UniProtKB/Swiss-Prot annotation:
Pfam families: Trypsin_2
Effect seen on changing C276A: Slightly increased proteolytic activity
Organism per entry: Arabidopsis thaliana
Name under which the protein is recorded: Glyoxysomal processing protease, glyoxysomal
Null allele phenotype: No visible phenotype, but loss of processing of glyoxysomal precursor proteins. Increased resistance to the herbicide precursor 4-(2,4-dichlorophenoxy) butyric acid (2,4-DB) and to the inhibitory effects of indole-3-butyric acid (IBA) on root elongation.
Localization (cell): Peroxisome
Amino acid sequence: MDVSKVVSFSRNFAVLVKVEGPDPKGLKMRKHAFHQYHSGNATLSASGILLPRDIFLSGEVAAKVLFEAGQDMALVLTVASVVEPFLTLGHRTSSSISQDPVKLIPGAMIEIMVEGQLKSEKEAPFWVPAQLLSLVDVPVSSAALQSLIEASSGSKDSGWDIGWSLVSAANGSQPSINIEHYSKPLMQLDEPHNANFMAKSATRMAILGVPLSLLGQPSMNFASSSSKGDTLVALGSPFGILSPVNFFNSVSTGSIANSYPSGSLKKSLMIADVRCLPGMEGAPVFAKNGHLIGILIRPLRQKNSGVEIQLVVPWGAITTACSHLLLEEPSVEGKASQWGSEVLSVKSDASIPAQVAIEKAMESVCLITVNDGVWASGIILNEHGLILTNAHLLEPWRYGKGGVYGEGFKPYVLGAEEFSSTGSKFWEQKSQTLPRKAPRNHYSSVGENIREYKHNFLQTGHRDIRVRLCHLDSWTWCPANVVYICKEQLDIALLQLEYVPGKLQPITANFSSPPLGTTAHVVGHGLFGPRCGLSPSICSGVVAKVVHAKRRLNTQSISQEVAEFPAMLETTAAVHPGGSGGAVLNSSGHMIGLVTSNARHGAGTVIPHLNFSIPCAVLAPIFKFAEDMQNTTILQTLDQPSEELSSIWALMPSLSPKTEQSLPNLPKLLKDGNNKQTKGSQFAKFIAETQDMFVKPTKLSRDVIPSKL
């Protein structure tokens, strides 16, 4: 289904939630990325979704709640974080939801902005008063988020927090009415920062009541299941109260990157590969067929890098948490809810075969740990357990600060100082060890018959290398040995499993140069390591740039004719630490590149959407060797130095020859190296020949236009 149709339909449900109340000390806006503040009143905003009362609430509970509210109502679901600062003290300081009715402080009020088409006499969006009915915890989503946060508790620098990176937790500075300006530091109140509190706070929802007569009754379907890579559409209002006309119901599209728990049809939490901004928390997230997937919440933010991971609470988890309020079981996918007249027609999705191919290719991506200290990703090349990964995982000292390929190369990218080595620190919990699962089958390892290829860079010290495979719907840990590490410009290495449990799923490669602008999926274990219990994540983008080399590698398997071949891929898909060694896939699920690195700004900020991969055309000898793993000379040819490849991967391509240009009437100096004149005599001759030029200025031609700096 066309995304524009999904957007048009979903605008019936997306709303902007505004909460205003007295704040004489300027404390309500803390932990919020933006606000308005006038005459002692603070205003916050978030996004929300409009829902029908008769579907969401049971008759008995609805009568009680709506009787207390005083009128018949429709419902709005939003995040609790937008209303919690304005709750009475007892509800604001409690870590759990009180049984007593929730109340706002005196003078606080809630309004929602809805699309104009929901009221026939108004064409423009308009504000509707709302009342706070209830707060709801989502236990399964909270537990999932807590487990992700606690997985990094052993590493102080790589820990996680909840909230937007625009929020300054250190001094409390917040952007005010103008997005470009920040208010003065605010006094901070002590809050618990344990994982349980953060997870509960992030996943808590608020149910609002709005007059039903103002809103009409649109119709909606609810998605019963979603898979990684599925397209999603989010409608939210970033910085909504700062300019509702400009920001109301903005559209952001992306895909599902991962979900928790892995391998389960009932999702507790989803990780979204989508660009979002503050104020979009509470936004409804729809599938490509128009079914509601869930609600966007505040992101998970990495403390040391500021990287934001967008999170979605699935609709199924919300309905489970609200089971005491539900009138009936949520409608299954493909079945319309029994309210309203407009139903979005659902047609078969032609992209399903491609999605199946991508899901199959994801089984070829594994997780690699070295000495329980770092982890990265790897790619299964054949059924005998040959794994392709990056050399910097095994020999990081070769790719450290000060030059990736030697002292002469310093990779600067838009002022960048160095590549970000995408191997990531493992959680520093020495007492915990990774389990090794006994294999169901023992295949004789072909690696035993391989003559290990050694060179100066291959270290023979003890290293505990383990690979986590995802096969037969289970995870299996296997020890592995180093087979090959490239000693030249290519950041590649090969590992061999000591034993092969069951049947593996090798990757399928595409050796052609991918067209610019075509879809690129990056699959790997970025950010979330072995203790997080997540399968590989998938982030989508496009092929932004293909850097070609004019000379082929000097190999026996590749033609030695002078011709262009792809030497580097750049994509807009997000690449995070731990994702190196992952696969870049095209829309058919075929591998087109090996992820090596992303970019880092000179100030230290990582740029995940500027990343670099080795094209499969360069990796052709690796795939040739993987066929029978006998001809090790194929690997030796990769160690031949290539000045052109080195310059490309150092981000220092050879410069074009300089054209000799001279100023008008400027005599050409003698440049013959055999000229025996001293510097003084040459300078004297220069002054004599140019004496007239210094008497009066030469009028420049009109063709020469001065350039403004």
